Amino acid sequence: MVCVRSFCAIHPRKDMVEAVSALPYDVMNTEEARAMVEGKPWSFLRISRPEVEFDRSHDPAGDEVYARSRENLAKFIKEGVMETDAEPQVYIYRQIMGYHVQTGVVACAHIDDYIENRIKKHEFTRKDKEDDRTRHVKETDAHTGPVFLAYRDDAAIDALVAADTKGATLYDFVTEDGIRHIVWRSSTPKAYEDAFEKVEACYIADG
């Protein structure tokens, strides 16, 4: 069965979430990323795409670039822009795009489930991209980009999500592309760990 665990997240202070929020690192090229961070000192792209802070002639895979991602994450935390959970948590994340609504559980998955094929793969990945993100994780000591997993409908998990989404939100804002983002902190993180133990497999959708 699938192993899901709560975790201590590093997340934006509530009043800074819009300033930090950024698109995934791999949906734009470097020039587009440079444009996106202009006038935005707290954009998360300064952590996920730190090459934007270097001259265009600088090697984007240089040691200094990866070091900058670590330095910027530390700066965001030191300046209070981002906070660290004191206790392990599970989050519920909802995106609303026009008439389309999707809701997910934000938690940690286990590497053993990937190795033992309880997390199902659907495509090959490029080694250069794997190496880049692996080094980024090692340098920052953080997973800065989530993996999107799907699982078959489960009534127990649905009930937990329904209960948590009736509570107060942690974040509720709309990004420049018109997508509404809503996040709740679960009041029963252990219940998700127990519920996912009955899920036979997850499927990689993206990440």
Question: Language model features by range: what are they?
Answer:
Residues 1-206:
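A cross-family signal for N-terminal binding/gating loops and helix N-caps
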